[in-house]
């Protein structure tokens, strides 16, 4: 809806801005026909004499505008006639030779070569791309670079006024054509005309039909189509596409809409016209398709084109199709026949790949498997296509029978075709080099993604009924072992592709993601701030990340905040979900009678319910109430109430007995997603992956906590439809030396703090009232106090944050289960 509203607003402003030129064109046509346009204000002889000085200047201006319009029309007409002549007199082979002779791209099909040659011969040879040195090519109303910025990215440079070389066109001697020689002779000494793409049509060669009630009149859209080179037809027969309002599909559709569905004619939103005109380039019809999912056999809408809420519903409910390295893909239909992944000489023949190139509008995946079914029948399963759009994918199952060697050869051939790399060096040694426009392997591990192996919603009751743990512990284990929290986490980050096991990747793949992040961190500091080079830099970063960790909605990230929110935070969450997958395993695929108890044992962690009348419970409740501020989502404000509290003692963490011997101990809040909790309980808190100069990562490789429950709630808040989450209370020793920071520390400062492993306090704009702080037990300070303004009014942090660089100085003490509730909610009594 936001997209639609913006487009309409822009279209309205364009329509108003075009009013004057439309009038001038009418006047020009009347004058061309020999008729003088009638004046609205007829002048007397006296008036004419009085205005005698002004009239010539007005006439001169009108004539200049008329001449300019006629000149543009003449240039377009001359080019059109030249194109017809070129196609008549030159062969495709001649055109290729002329392009090569002028250092232009001569590759591609006839449809690519012909317009390229016409442009070069009439307007002059194009200079190379100023960003990457590639070849420019006219596409729509812009010249786009066809080169590559790196192996990860196509060049994104585009312009409507490209630089061209001077001098005559070079025609190779073996092009024997009198027409070309004669035409070149005529052009000697003349300058090349300048190509004005705005005068040419976006919709050139297209016949378009309009259907049903639209947001604007049919007359408006008809004018836009015809003004940009297209034609409008009243019938659906023979048209390129039918344009309709998105509301048509919900209202049953008009006659034209229904007829288009029957004929298989594309039906697109009116925004296709608006956006094509706005962007000065014909947009792909598939991206504006509003009818495919109406037809039962239709292609369906890509997940990336759905409303984000609809996409979330689709992916949350979707069955995970590929759960790990040994899992048979669901779409092959061979699992039900007893199929399993073929393995020979230590190689498991199951590969997944992806590639994202935003400049080339590419976001694809590929799956290849050799599947053995009973009676030694070997099948090759192959799937390749756009991520989130199964109906557009190329997909096949090929039965090789007992021809095992042939199946392996075909698998290896496809691997090399898809990636440009050899198969065995990758599988045996993980040697791989990304090739331009080729896919990159998603290194799956031998296990089961928690979205498949975890407890499904309908299985929760049975799992809890068989659990021998204390009911209060069963409750939390049921939450942490369910599929739901991990599905939601991946959905919120956009990494919920059903075809790919993002929750079962190798440590090597995750390490590559971390190394990539660290490289970017260094490169960003010296990256250009604006211009084509900056665009290319950020596009390459985005392409690389969304190739390593695929999504249905890739976009170009820019700035430290987006790297922190999407890359750093995303990597940490995917890493922790992978740990959960290994801990939980395949709950109901195993023979375990009590999977929840088994997972609890693997944690190596003691979890016990804190009773409500205990001193610890009362202390924590007071600490939360004092340091919490409501979370605001849109216009709704949410408060947090304590549901239950658990005391935690983990064998992986420093014990409380060890921590209590350390200096400057503080009980602090830590916010985390529920999907990250199993990792924290098993391994303790892990320092942030790197230093990024934004809150959350500004202290570098540190464990960051706060004295404000409000700060932790910002990380722990889930969603309005999932109001339950967990906050963590940990005892942290800040060491003997504590440094206070009021601003954003620089790279050198962070490096020094990491090396010294000192305790750091980042002073927020709000702080807890020191007069209310108290000591808990064994000298542990509880900074519990009302949130008040601090003296650091211009600091980057809203609340105080504490950074600890040594994981041995932090121990999780409590898990606080909270429920977020809407404040000031009006309750309507039953009548």
Swiss-Prot record:
An example Gene Ontology CC term for this record: nucleolus
SMART domains reported for this sequence: BRCT, PADR1, WGR
Gene Ontology process terms (BP): double-strand break repair
Residues covered by region (Zinc ribbon): 124-168
Cell location: Nucleus
Record-annotated PADR1 zinc-binding domain positions: 49-199
Pfam families the UniProt entry points to: BRCT (PF00533), PADR1_N (PF21728), PARP (PF00644), PARP_reg (PF02877), Zn_ribbon_PADR1 (PF08063)
Main location, first listed in the record: nucleus
Reaction catalysed by this enzyme: L-aspartyl-[protein] + NAD(+) = 4-O-(ADP-D-ribosyl)-L-aspartyl-[protein] + nicotinamide; L-glutamyl-[protein] + NAD(+) = 5-O-(ADP-D-ribosyl)-L-glutamyl-[protein] + nicotinamide
PARP alpha-helical domain segment(s): 466-585
Binding site for Zn(2+): 129, 132, 145, 155
GO function term, MF aspect, one: NAD+-protein-aspartate ADP-ribosyltransferase activity
Biased composition regions of type Basic and acidic residues, renumbered to the chain: 15-32, 43-66
Residue ranges constituting the BRCT domain according to the UniProt record: 200-290
EC class name: transferase
PROSITE patterns with a match to the protein in the record: BRCT, PADR1, PARP_ALPHA_HD, PARP_CATALYTIC, WGR
Entry's EC annotation: 2.4.2.-
Induction: Induced by heavy ion irradiation.
Keywords, sorted A to Z: ADP-ribosylation, Glycosyltransferase, Metal-binding, NAD, Nucleotidyltransferase, Nucleus, Transferase, Zinc, Zinc-finger
Matches recorded under InterPro entries: ARTD/PARP, BRCT_dom, BRCT_dom_sf, PARP1-like_PADR1_N, PARP1-like_PADR1_Zn_ribbon, Poly(ADP-ribose)pol_cat_dom, Poly(ADP-ribose)pol_reg_dom, Poly(ADP-ribose)pol_reg_dom_sf
Record domain WGR: where: 338-439
Region called Disordered, residue ranges: 1-69
UniProt domain PARP catalytic: residue ranges: 594-827
Task of the protein: Involved in the base excision repair (BER) pathway, by catalyzing the poly(ADP-ribosyl)ation of a limited number of acceptor proteins involved in chromatin architecture and in DNA metabolism. This modification follows DNA damages and appears as an obligatory step in a detection/signaling pathway leading to the reparation of DNA strand breaks.
Family statement drawn from the similarity comment of this UniProt entry: Belongs to the ARTD/PARP family.
Descriptive protein name: Protein ADP-ribosyltransferase PARP3
Taxonomic path: Eukaryota, Viridiplantae, Streptophyta, Embryophyta, Tracheophyta
């Amino acid at each position: 809806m936001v997209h639609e509203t913006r487009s309409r607003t822009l279209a309205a402003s364009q329509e108003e801005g075009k009013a004057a030129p439309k009038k001038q064109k009418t006047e020009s046509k009347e004058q061309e026909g020999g008729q003088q346009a009638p004046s609205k204000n007829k002048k007397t002889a006296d008036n004419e004499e009085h205005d005698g000085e002004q009239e010539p200047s007005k006439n001169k201006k009108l004539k200049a505008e008329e001449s300019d319009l006629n000149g543009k029309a003449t240039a377009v007409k001359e080019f059109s006639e030249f194109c017809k002549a070129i196609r008549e007199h030159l062969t495709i082979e001649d055109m290729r030779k002329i392009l090569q002779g002028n250092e232009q791209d001569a590759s591609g099909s006839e449809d690519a070569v012909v317009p390229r040659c016409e442009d070069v011969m009439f307007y002059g040879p194009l200079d190379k791309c100023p960003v990457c040195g590639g070849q420019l090519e006219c596409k729509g109303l812009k010249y786009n670079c066809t080169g590559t910025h790196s192996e990860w990215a196509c060049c994104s440079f585009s312009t409507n006024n490209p630089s061209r070389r001077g001098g005559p066109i070079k025609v190779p001697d073996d092009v024997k054509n009198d027409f070309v020689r004669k035409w070149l002779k005529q052009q000697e000494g003349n300058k090349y005309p300048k190509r004005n793409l705005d005068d040419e049509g976006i919709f050139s060669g297209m016949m378009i039909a309009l259907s049903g009630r639209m947001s604007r009149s049919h007359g408006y859209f008809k004018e836009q189509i015809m003004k940009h080179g297209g034609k409008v037809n009243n019938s659906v027969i023979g048209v390129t596409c039918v344009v309709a309002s998105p509301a048509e599909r919900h209202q049953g559709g008009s006659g034209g809409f229904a007829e288009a569905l029957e004929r298989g004619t594309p039906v697109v939103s009116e925004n296709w016209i608006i956006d094509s005109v706005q962007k000065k380039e014909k947009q792909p019809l598939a991206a504006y398709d509003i009818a495919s999912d109406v037809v039962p056999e239709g292609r369906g809408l890509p997940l990336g084109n759905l409303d984000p809420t609809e996409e979330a519903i689709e992916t949350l409910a979707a069955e995970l199709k590929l759960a790990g390295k040994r899992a048979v893909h669901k779409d092959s239909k061979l699992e039900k026949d007893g199929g399993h992944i073929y393995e020979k000489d230590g190689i498991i023949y199951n590969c997944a790949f992806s590639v994202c190139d935003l400049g080339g509008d590419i976001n694809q995946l590929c799956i290849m498997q050799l599947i053995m079914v009973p009676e030694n029948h070997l099948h090759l399963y192959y799937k390749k296509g756009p991520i989130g759009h199964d109906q557009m994918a190329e997909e096949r199952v090929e039965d090789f029978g007992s021809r095992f060697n042939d199946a392996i050869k075909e698998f290896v051939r496809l691997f090399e075709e898809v990636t440009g790399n050899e198969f065995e060096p990758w599988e045996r040694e993980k040697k791989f080099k990304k090739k331009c426009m080729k896919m990159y392997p998603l290194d799956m591990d031998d296990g089961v993604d928690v979205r498949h192996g975890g407890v499904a919603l309908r299985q929760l009751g049975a799992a809890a009924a068989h659990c021998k743990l204390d009911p209060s512990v069963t409750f939390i284990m049921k939450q942490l072992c369910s599929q739901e929290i991990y599905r939601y986490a991946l959905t919120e980050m956009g990494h919920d592709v059903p075809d790919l096991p993002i929750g079962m990747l190798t440590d090597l793949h995750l390490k590559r993601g971390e190394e990539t992040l660290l490289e970017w961190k260094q490169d960003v500091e010296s990256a250009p701030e604006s211009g084509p080079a900056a665009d290319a830099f950020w596009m390459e970063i985005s392409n690389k990340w969304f190739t390593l960790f695929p999504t249905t909605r890739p976009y170009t990230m820019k700035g430290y905040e987006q790297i922190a929110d999407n890359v750093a935070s995303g990597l940490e969450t995917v890493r922790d979900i992978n740990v959960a997958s290994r801990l939980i395993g395949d709950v109901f695929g195993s023979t375990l009678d009590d999977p929840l108890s088994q997972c609890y044992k693997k944690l190596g962690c003691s979890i016990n319910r804190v009773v409500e009348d205990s001193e610890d419970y009362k202390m924590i409740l007071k600490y939360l109430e004092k340091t919490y501020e409501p979370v605001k989502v849109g216009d709704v404000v949410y408060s947090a109430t304590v549901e239950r509290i658990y005391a935690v003692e983990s064998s992986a963490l420093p014990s409380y007995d060890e921590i209590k011997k350390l200096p400057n101990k503080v009980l602090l809040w830590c916010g985390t997603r529920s999907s990250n909790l199993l990792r924290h309980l098993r391994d303790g808190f892990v320092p942030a992956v790197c230093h990024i100069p934004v809150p959350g990562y500004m202290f570098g490789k540190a464990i960051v906590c706060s004295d404000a429950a409000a700060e932790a709630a910002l990380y722990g808040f889930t969603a309005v439809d999932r109001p339950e989450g967990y906050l963590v209370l940990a005892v942290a020793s800040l060491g003997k030396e504590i440094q206070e920071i009021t601003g954003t520390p620089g790279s050198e400062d962070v490096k020094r703090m990491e090396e010294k492993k000192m305790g750091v306090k980042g002073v927020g704009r709000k702080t807890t009232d020191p007069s209310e702080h108290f000591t808990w037990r064994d000298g542990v300070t509880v900074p519990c106090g009302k949130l008040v303004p601090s003296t650091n009014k211009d600091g980057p942090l809203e609340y105080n944050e504490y950074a600890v660089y040594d994981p041995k100085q932090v121990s999780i003490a409590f898990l606080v289960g909270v429920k977020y509730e809407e404040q000031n909610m009006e309750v309507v009594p039953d009548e």
